[in-house]
Amino acid sequence: PEKARYAGKAEIAQPKLNLCRERLENGFYEAIPQLLRNYLIDKLTADAAARHIDAANDATNVFNNLLTERLTKPDGSQRRLATIPTGELIDGFGRLLAYVAPWYAGESDPLPPRDDPRRYTFNLNLIANGWAAFFPIYPSLPSNRDFNLAIAAAETAWTEKRGAWASYGDDLLLAYEYRACIKLAAAADAEEGIKKAFQRVCVDLRSLKIVGLYGFYDIPPCYRLWIWEQDLAEATEILNLVQE
């Protein structure tokens, strides 16, 4: 989830979400399919901003505890942090796309076997315990083996209602949903808002069916794959995607 720095503290962000809800209800965004509008409206509760920001802060605390736990060796000394770049190394916003994991130095601190949970990245840990949304974006995807591991972890976290879903409920806005709603509220007109809020095509990982810019509402979060519109033709061919 996003912290307060994205759209302000809850008392600042909530009026923006309220405006988004009003626009979704009053026809301002009639070009957005009704079922997607309903999906977002159900999540735009009176405390949506506070719950989202609180979940983000809780996730940070969980991550910090994981760092302490997994980077501390049995003798009390500290492991270094390994950074593993993947796919599109630098995204369109200048961010490094990478996985992070404990660095096992060698004989004195040997690398665990491949299937050992001690080999998991922190990214996978947070997905598995329900404190990070599963948000794979083509082409920045791991190997098939690691991708399937992440899907399974996300599925378990969702079906068992772990982490953020246990603490804040199924109607918690995920980070990309939160950002979309803020953009819908800020836009001067409907066309601008829709263009800024919905830039990635969603694919249902269960069937590899392309559900488009607006069909993600019908896909559980653990089965959503995202593709930038400009990458869709390439991804369709490489991943054998199915047109809806």
Q: What kind of feature is each model-predicted range?
A:
Residues 1-244:
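Small beta-barrel nucleic-acid-binding modules, primarily SNase/OB-fold domains
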